[in-house]
Regions:
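Generic structural signal for hydrophobic
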Residues: 23-24, 49, 76, 98, ...
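Conserved, mostly hydrophobic/aromatic
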Residues: 7, 31, 61, 84, ...
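Glycine-rich phosphate-binding active-site loops on the catalytic face of alpha/beta enzymes
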Residues: 83-91, 189-221
């Protein structure tokens, strides 16, 4: 069974990102490139990771008019991204445009509510609590054609019951048991859980970055997270993450590791 771990490559240094990816090896089923890396290295970051045999989640959280988001999706697919995030708050027309532009080249993952958002943050922008907003946004995204949802591990059990086994549920805000680290200025994740708890609740994939990339041994830390997740049981709905289609030109560099 493929690892459910998505390794977050939170750096502006492409060589560092590649080094982390290679150190994690097969312990990470995918890697995530976000604004920090792509802002510094551009689409070449995705192309380099995909060319290294990696399945790439491009975490741009697109939220714009439908035509602009569609153009962004086409560019992401050309670069080699397999999953691309958009904000479900963009609404049905934007989500449908993203799905249509992605076609069969990549998948659209709709972000519900950021894991950094607490009740006060949501109230400040006029949104209901996450327990109410997340199921509504997830249902909207699925109706619009999205087959992957990004949500906090605290909401994944309710979404798994609501959406069934076919929808891929991807959980950031995952912290290994006992990890006490935080970024400068404090912890920026408000709704978190352990890898085991996220998997038991029904997650398909878990996104983990700093607890692995800040460790002294990236490979060992990645394997520990993967093992903790898989020991809790199979990914949500009992489906192997590898069953989701890979890009046609993936090189499979890590299959032999």
């Amino acid at each position: 069974m493929e690892s459910p771990l998505v390794l977050a490559l939170d750096t502006d240094d492409l060589e560092q990102a590649l080094a982390w990816s290679r150190a994690a090896g097969k312990a990470a089923g995918m890697v995530k490139a976000g604004l920090e890396l792509v802002g510094a290295a551009g689409p070449a970051a995705v192309a380099a990771l995909a060319g290294d045999g990696r399945r790439v989640m491009l975490d741009l959280k697109l939220h714009d008019i439908p035509a602009t988001v569609a153009g962004g999706m086409r560019a992401a697919a050309r670069a080699g991204a397999e999953l691309v995030t958009v904000h479900a708050l963009g609404g049905p027309a934007m989500l449908e445009a993203a799905v249509q532009a992605a076609g069969d080249r990549c998948r659209v993952a709709a972000v519900t509510i950021l894991t950094s958002a607490g009740p006060e943050d949501l109230a400040a922008v006029g949104l209901p609590p996450a327990a109410e907003a997340v199921p509504r946004l997830a249902a909207l995204a699925v109706r619009s054609g999205c087959r992957a949802i990004v949500c906090s591990p605290l909401e994944v059990a309710a979404l798994r019951a609501q959406l069934g086994p076919e929808v891929e549920l991807i959980c950031p805000g995952v912290r290994p048991a006992g990890w006490g680290g935080s970024p400068p200025g404090g912890n920026d994740q408000a709704r978190v859980a352990t890898p085991a708890a996220a998997m038991v609740a029904g997650a398909t994939r878990i996104v983990v970055g700093r607890p692995i990339t800040r460790s002294d041994d990236v490979g060992a830390a990645a394997r520990a997270v993967r093992d903790e997740a898989l020991a809790a049981g199979p990914p949500g709905g009992g489906e192997d993450p590898a069953n989701h289609p890979k890009p046609a030109d993936a090189h499979g560099r890590f299959d032999a590791l």
